Amino acid sequence: MWFTKSSKDVLKEMNVSEKTGLSTEEVKKRLEKYGPNKLKGKPKKSLLQLFLAQLQDMLIYVLIGAAVINIIAHGKDGIADALIILAVVLINAVVGVVQESKAEKALEALQQMTTPKSLVRRNGEVIEVNSEELVPGDILVIDAGRYIPADVRLIESANLQIEESALTGESVPSEKDANFITTDAKIPIGDKENMAFMSTMATYGRGEGVVVETGMNTEIGKIAQILDEDNNTLTPLQVKLEELGKILGYGALAICGIIFVIGLIQGREAVDMFMTAISLAVAAIPEGLVAIVAIVLSLGVKTMSRKNAIVRKLPAVETLGAVNIVCSDKTGTLTQNKMTVVKTYTLDNLRDISSQDGQKANVDETELIRSFVLCSDASVENGQDIGDPTEVALIVLGNKFDLEKNALNTKYKRVSENPFDSDRKLMSTLNEEGGKYRVHTKGAIDNILTRANKILVNGEILPLTEEEKNKILKVAEEMSDDALRVLGVAFKDVDSQILPEEMEKDLVVVGIVGMIDPPRTEVKDSIVEAKNAGITPIMITGDHKNTAVAIAKELGIATDISQSLTGAEIDEIPDDKFAKEVNKYRVFARVSPEHKVKIVKAFKEQGNIVSMTGDGVNDAPSLKFADIGVAMGITGTDVSKGASDMILTDDNFTTIIHAIEEGRNIFNNIKKTIIFLLSCNLGEVLCVFIATLFGWAIPLVATQLLWVNLITDTLPAISLGMDPGDKEVMTRKPRNPKESFFSEGAGMRSIVGGVLIGVLTLVAFYLGIIHSGTVPISAVKDSNPATREILTYGRTMAFIVLTFSQLFYSLSMRNSKKTIFEIGFFGNKFLIGSIIIGIVLQIGLTSIPSIAQMFKVTAIDPSHWGMVIGLSLVPFVVNEIIKVISRRRND
């Protein structure tokens, strides 16, 4: 009952000092004893379970039934066909297991990458660790925006509020008090004011606590609630494909049924027609589409993670390709987030700050720097910056003037605070020295001046005049014009401790500092690339308009200050008017989280697909409202990461543009895979359907159709999904999110390709039959023993042409506009490998007598190989010619 004990007793029981925390050696011992700090998820399926799951499909049941019927009808002669059918079923199942295992591993890797980090004190230093590495006894540092990674007994709290809906169902945050103790052992979780629980979230204030329970021993672990998102749901694209597959499937089944009936009317053998119809259905129904898309998406996610973009939700990969508005924070995303104070200003005293240590300050400058340092939560320990970069810059400024943070904190102990929030744009602390109290306030200078009535001048506190206010604001504006970030500071002395809401009244303004945060060198090129791709970059920042516009001009985002608006100006514009005019603005400055939502909403109302970046607790609404919410991996809070679709591990704008490029290529790869598969399926159906209508023998037997389906589905199709992508994809406009798979002539290409493959397979069948020159094709039947060898030869020709034409045709599918000679034959090594494997397997299948007999094929005359290859190349050549003609027409 940790909540019934004092913090001192808990620390003693845990054998840990709150000032030093655990040692590295002790952490190792406790990690071995208690295990990793994580909840046990759903048990993983075994390989056998995955394998059996692949067999639970209606088409598989039909195939197995067909194999059994074949043995019953044909006895020993049907065993070979049955074995091939079962082999195809098993191979498909194995491929399915491999696909699902890969997807599962990709998701596990993704979850590992997005595991929250925690701030802990170990060996006397505050460090960031993976939350799974926490152990009982760790001293946890809590601040707004972080998830609570374990059950914690609070030992210090400052206006701390924690949202505990995961445990209590209450969305209103609970106020926490480290000094609270109760003897009531049955007190509800929501009333345990001195405790913080795993999977809850700090929304305000800060605190420290000692970890008392981890993993399954936590409150959330006891009720075995698995909070991880269900990543197994289908994406919108996969849902569309499933629907498309059903429509095509019903169509294919109808055609197969017609073929079966026509065959019976023509007096063909019922069992053979049944086998052909079933095999054709399996070959024609694109049941592999959804699985292939899942593989392409997961491979895309893996590629993006290597480029510093972690995709949390698979639908984001699809949406990325349609993004045309990228709203980005300035600090850290467009800039380097390496803040350095380069100027200070106290009344009538503007000073440049050098990089040297040991600098001297006058009385006002000393007060300015001391107040800034005391009113900061960041620290610099052993050369490691911990905390907000702006605050780190203030700590470094203090170090340059021998006003070191730890020494100041010891002398002027912090008693309470009013944490920063994005509405006030201020932070205040109350510090004590020898029974006296002083409030230190830092933040936006205009907000400070509205709360100040005095000013520090040469160590004296004097009334603040309008003239002095204007002087300060003028210097602040000049700093902003020089692209400096401006921060003001003030203080006031009080006789006793006061409430946080009383801190920011009647302040004594001291001065301002100007910080530089240089633009990222690579961002300028990325903005040019974005504009060429039809993407409009938008800067959204809390900084002053002048600072924001100066950076925006340098980066090429804006050309004039008329393209900018402040939050206050947005408030003056009616919502409907703002939505109509929003497209003309490029910079939004001094905005609150509410403004961000309003901006995203306005852009979306104009039909834009919007990406929005964010890092703070209050950014969650705008991240969720955007089509793509992008959280910062370095500076972002756990709350913003939880609300996002994608996390940037390097907080870099360029990464967003790379992710959009990858998203476009992934969608294009999926599209070309779909068109290729449908062309192949259409060719197979047409070939058998036309032959049946003509009264010819069926050109392809069941086992051959299944073999073709296996080759084309699992090799070239997946390889097309792994295509490196079009180098010119970022020179085109974003796609319309409502765009069909069959847009831009893709549907016609699919039909033309399918018709060519089907007709050429029939031509090969016909040529193979008539090569003997003695029997008309109408006389060649399965039931006629005299023509069986001729029929086998014709089927072999058709079989090879069907397979080869699909393999060659896949090369032409890599780009819908450029020929293979322009993009290069060997750009996709996986596809080349798939084609070579397919050709080798096909030649082996027809050349090895025992295998050839099973598939009812035979070796063909060497003189006919030229004919076979020539016919097989026709769909590829025609598609390449169509590209050239289409491009000339468009030009």
PLM region descriptions:
Residues 758-770:
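Transmembrane alpha-helix/helix-exit interface in multi-pass inner-membrane proteins
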Residues 1-734, 739-742, 755, 799, ...:
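Conserved cytosolic headpiece of P-type ATPases
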